């Protein structure tokens, strides 16, 4: 039976205080609970020692602070780069995957925003089986907290990328609440500039996100410089073609001042030619705003026959962009030996 208790992690601090008032509980206790959840990061209401026993009992009867449970049989650490991939189980039994990537500048957690995905991008494992449902703010937050527990010793998460399973902007309201909670200075206090949200191009929601005027990083899953090619990779492009997507990106930059990153998965003999690199350079230069391109060599997925180009081809593509004054990086492959691409572990376990 699904648990219908109120998840306290679905609430901002203000909402938590309002909830306590409606329940007739002392409002200042809400801040103490917030501290226990995000500073102390406890797993149980019962251990909240500065909360009166009677209130703790009422909280346990009416509320929950655990929105997912770690599947201890599905935690994998890459011996080559330290990437950690783990699966968690939601209250309704649905699996959700999370990835921790280790860098010199800190630990980054890649969280899922949906269980599965409806976008049907042809190169992505997340779309296998479609979308089961959106994740709640608490279910997204618990992935971050679970990552802190999975990390060894005193290590913790420094950066968040919402690039796991699902299209974050399709789960817009829950995403915004998640962002506000993890950014709260009385909680996890992760700065917006340490958070990246990736979208395959839901144009109306990009405009909505621009109006929020958050200082987060926006990444666009572009993967092709023209509609003919992008239509074959991302079905959503038939609804919101590239020119509409890029117009929304310009508005986002004007509102926030934040440079946008364009992600480009390089697929051998499909979108990796020098002519396409030149076309991409022209398209991005015409935006007349700061941009960055993140080239991603295709990470093998069983569901497709795509492969990554040879390193020389990747270098040629990168060099062409750089010669046109486009900032570019090549993402280092991480977690290949632990099903590191989004959706891979969940898809394998579901089978």
From Swiss-Prot:
List the catalysed reactions. Answer: adenosine(2503) in 23S rRNA + 2 reduced [2Fe-2S]-[ferredoxin] + 2 S-adenosyl-L-methionine = 2-methyladenosine(2503) in 23S rRNA + 5'-deoxyadenosine + L-methionine + 2 oxidized [2Fe-2S]-[ferredoxin] + S-adenosyl-L-homocysteine; adenosine(37) in tRNA + 2 reduced [2Fe-2S]-[ferredoxin] + 2 S-adenosyl-L-methionine = 2-methyladenosine(37) in tRNA + 5'-deoxyadenosine + L-methionine + 2 oxidized [2Fe-2S]-[ferredoxin] + S-adenosyl-L-homocysteine
| Assigned EC number | 2.1.1.192
* Textual note on the cofactor: Binds 1 [4Fe-4S] cluster. The cluster is coordinated with 3 cysteines and an exchangeable S-adenosyl-L-methionine.
- State whether keyword S-adenosyl-L-methionine applies: yes
Q: Does the keyword S-adenosyl-L-methionine apply?
A: yes
Single GO molecular function: rRNA (adenine(2503)-C2-)-methyltransferase activity
Subcellular location(s) per record: Cytoplasm
Disulfide bond sites = 110-342
Binding positions (S-adenosyl-L-methionine): 166-167, 198, 221-223, 299
SUPFAM superfamilies, per the entry: Radical SAM enzymes
**What are the names of the required cofactors?**
[4Fe-4S] cluster
Q: What is its main location?
A: cytoplasm
Q: Look up the record and report any one GO term of the cellular component aspect.
A: cytoplasm
Residues annotated as the enzyme's active site: 97, 342
Q: What else is known?
A: Reaction proceeds by a ping-pong mechanism involving intermediate methylation of a conserved cysteine residue.
**In which family does this protein belong, per the annotation?**
Belongs to the radical SAM superfamily. RlmN family.
Q: Indicate what this protein is called per its UniProt record.
A: Probable dual-specificity RNA methyltransferase RlmN
- The species is Natranaerobius thermophilus (strain ATCC BAA-1301 / DSM 18059 / JW/NM-WN-LF)
Q: What is the lineage of its organism?
A: Bacteria, Bacillati, Bacillota, Clostridia, Natranaerobiales
């Amino acid at each position: 039976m699904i648990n219908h208790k109120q998840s306290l992690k679905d609430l901002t601090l203000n909402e938590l205080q309002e909830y306590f008032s409606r329940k007739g509980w002392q409002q200042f206790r809400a801040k103490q609970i917030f501290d226990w959840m995000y500073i102390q990061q406890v797993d149980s209401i019962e251990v909240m020692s500065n909360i009166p026993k009677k209130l703790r009992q009422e909280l346990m009867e009416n509320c929950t602070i655990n929105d997912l449970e770690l599947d201890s049989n599905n935690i994998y650490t890459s011996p080559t780069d330290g990437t950690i991939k783990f699966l968690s189980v939601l209250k309704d039994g649905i699996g959700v995957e999370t990835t921790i990537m280790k860098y010199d500048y800190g630990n980054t957690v890649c969280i899922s925003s949906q269980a599965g995905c409806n976008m049907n991008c042809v190169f992505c494992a997340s779309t296998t089986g479609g979308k089961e449902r959106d994740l709640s703010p608490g279910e997204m937050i618990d992935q971050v907290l679970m990552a802190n527990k999975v990390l060894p010793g005193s290590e913790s998460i420094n950066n968040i990328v919402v690039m796991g399973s699902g299209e974050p902007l399709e789960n817009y309201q829950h995403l915004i609440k998640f962002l506000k909670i993890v950014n709260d200075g009385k909680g996890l206090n992760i700065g917006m500039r340490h958070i990246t949200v990736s979208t395959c191009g839901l144009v109306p929601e990009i405009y909505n996100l621009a109006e929020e005027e958050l200082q987060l990083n926006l990444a666009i899953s572009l993967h092709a410089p023209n509609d003919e090619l992008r239509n074959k990779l991302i079905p959503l492009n038939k609804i919101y073609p590239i020119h509409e997507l890029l117009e929304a990106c310009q508005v986002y930059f004007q509102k926030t001042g934040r440079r946008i990153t364009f992600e480009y998965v390089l697929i051998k003999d499909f979108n990796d030619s020098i002519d396409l690199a030149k076309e991409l350079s022209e398209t991005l230069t015409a935006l007349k705003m700061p941009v960055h391109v993140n080239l991603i060599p295709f990470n093998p997925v069983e569901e497709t026959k795509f492969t990554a180009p040879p390193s020389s081809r990747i270098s040629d593509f990168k060099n062409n962009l750089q010669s046109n004054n486009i900032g570019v990086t090549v993402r280092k492959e991480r977690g290949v030996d632990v099903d590191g691409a989004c959706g891979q572990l969940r898809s394998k376990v579901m089978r």
